[in-house]
Amino acid sequence: MNPLIIKLGGVLLDSEEALERLFTALVNYRESHQRPLVIVHGGGCVVDELMKGLNLPVKKKDGLRVTPADQIGIITGALAGTANKTLLAWAKKHHIASVGLFLGDGDSVKVTQLDEALGHVGLAQPGSPKLINMLLENGFLPVVSSIGVTDDGQLMNVNADQAATALAATLGADLILLSDVSGILDGKGQRIAEMTASKAEQLIDQGIITDGMIVKVNAALDAARALGRPVDIASWRHAEQLPALFNGTPIGTRILA
């Protein structure tokens, strides 16, 4: 069975209640299904807190965090350090054997600089499945942060949705993007069950899909095209629905290629 990548985002890492619900759902799912799971995470809220504490400015361009050279070390520490190890600690608490990774481990996801104007922000592309497949075959839950490294050794901050997409392409995995919202909402705040590229373009033009959600929707559309299968955007808030989601039942917005 092909693996399932669960991308975690939003304020999930800040909420003990949400993490408890998520990991309880993961335990229940793993007990009843043999399907291998991989977690990919960002941690914007962890980074924002740290930057605020250090009195450093947070600047975004087109929904992507601008990452100057003097901030990449701090952001790496927050994402590959604090955020990653927090998730590993929760996995340990729930008796799930897990391994913490970043995109560069085993060359799992290849990363190049996206745009000089964004600084240390990376473009993620499929890499080698060897390391993660080996971990999955031995029953481990890989927990992968969205920090990558270029061929010339430069650390890069990668949008976590895009990182998860590249890793899904690497592994031939299905992909779920878990976030703060229950899916993509229309102009009246109602959840849209299915989304196509043309519908997304229309909602972006109308200003209904904005900022970070544009990045999320485009990442999901890219993933659906690259993988040749639908990608789900859903909320982690409804933990009781997560096992159904992991089984392929849509509970948020299903993005069609």
UniProtKB/Swiss-Prot annotation:
Keywords: Amino-acid biosynthesis, Arginine biosynthesis, ATP-binding, Cytoplasm, Kinase, Nucleotide-binding, Transferase
Location(s) in or outside the cell: Cytoplasm
One Gene Ontology cellular component: cytoplasm
Enzyme Commission (EC) number: 2.7.2.8
Annotated positions binding substrate: G43, G44, R65, N157
SUPFAM superfamilies: Carbamate kinase-like
Pathway assigned to this chain's UniProt record: Amino-acid biosynthesis; L-arginine biosynthesis; N(2)-acetyl-L-ornithine from L-glutamate: step 2/4
One of the GO BP terms on file: L-arginine biosynthetic process
InterPro entries, per the entry: AceGlu_kinase-like_sf, AcgluKinase_fam, ArgB, Asp/Glu/Uridylate_kinase, NAGK-NC
Main subcellular localisation: cytoplasm
Residues the entry annotates as binding ATP: D180, V181, S182, G183, I184, L185, I208, I209, T210
Residue ranges that the Swiss-Prot or TrEMBL entry lists as coiled coil: none
Highest taxon in the source lineage: Bacteria
One MF term in the entry's GO annotations: acetylglutamate kinase activity
Reaction(s) this enzyme catalyzes, per UniProt: N-acetyl-L-glutamate + ATP = N-acetyl-L-glutamyl 5-phosphate + ADP
Annotated site location: Transition state stabilizer: K7, K216
Listed NCBIfam families: argB
Function: Catalyzes the ATP-dependent phosphorylation of N-acetyl-L-glutamate.
Similarity field: Belongs to the acetylglutamate kinase family. ArgB subfamily.
Subunit organization: Homodimer.
Name the record gives this protein: Acetylglutamate kinase
